[in-house]
A protein has these predicted regions:
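An exposed tryptophan-centered "aromatic clamp" motif
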Residues: 66, 74-87, 93-168
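Short, compositionally biased
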Residues: 1-85, 102-105
Length: 168
């Protein structure tokens, strides 16, 4: 069930290839797993951090490529230990989109120039509409709830170009 406690965090959905789920997406609890750390502090390319669906590998690539000074957010996620879980990572672009789609905190309009996600389960082939996705039914993720996303852009672990990551 979307928003239900699971694996040290909360179940946010599934990601897959060709409509077949490959893994669950779990978001960490706000109290210990949310950060405003910079994605990257250098204008250099990161070898390998370009997957739209493999946040663990992107995060590992960033950690291997540089120190916490260069990749503060990736190191924060990689080093996180909460509720007995130590396998946290920055979500890849399409993983992050699933989180937004399923855990959208507000009833406000969406940006209608995004939303296509061939890796979501089920896959989404069209952009958002002003009302889709709708506000999540998971109360703790609704505006004012203890786990609600703040109104801001969130970095993904997917590098767009040297020094720039993709955000949702």
């Amino acid at each position: 069930v979307i928003g239900q406690a699971y694996g040290g965090g909360f179940y946010a959905g599934q990601i897959g290839v060709g409509g077949v789920a490959t893994h669950y997406i779990i978001v960490g609890p706000v109290a210990s797993a949310q950060s405003t750390l910079q994605w990257k502090n250098a204008m250099t390319a990161t070898t390998g951090a370009d997957s739209d669906i493999d946040g663990p590998q992107n995060t590992a690539d960033m950690v291997a490529d540089g120190s916490a000074t260069v990749y503060p957010a990736a190191h924060f996620c990689n080093d996180l230990s909460t509720a007995g879980q130590t396998d946290w990572h920055m979500p890849a672009k399409n993983e992050l989109e699933v989180c937004y789609f399923n855990l959208k905190p507000t009833t406000g309009n969406n940006n209608t120039s995004s939303g296509i996600n061939p890796n979501a389960v089920p896959a989404r082939a069209s952009n958002y509409t002003s009302g889709n996705p709708a506000q999540t039914s998971a109360a703790v993720f609704q505006s004012g709830g203890s786990e609600a996303f703040v109104t801001a852009s969130y970095w993904s672990s997917t590098e767009f170009s040297a020094g720039y990551g993709l955000a949702q």
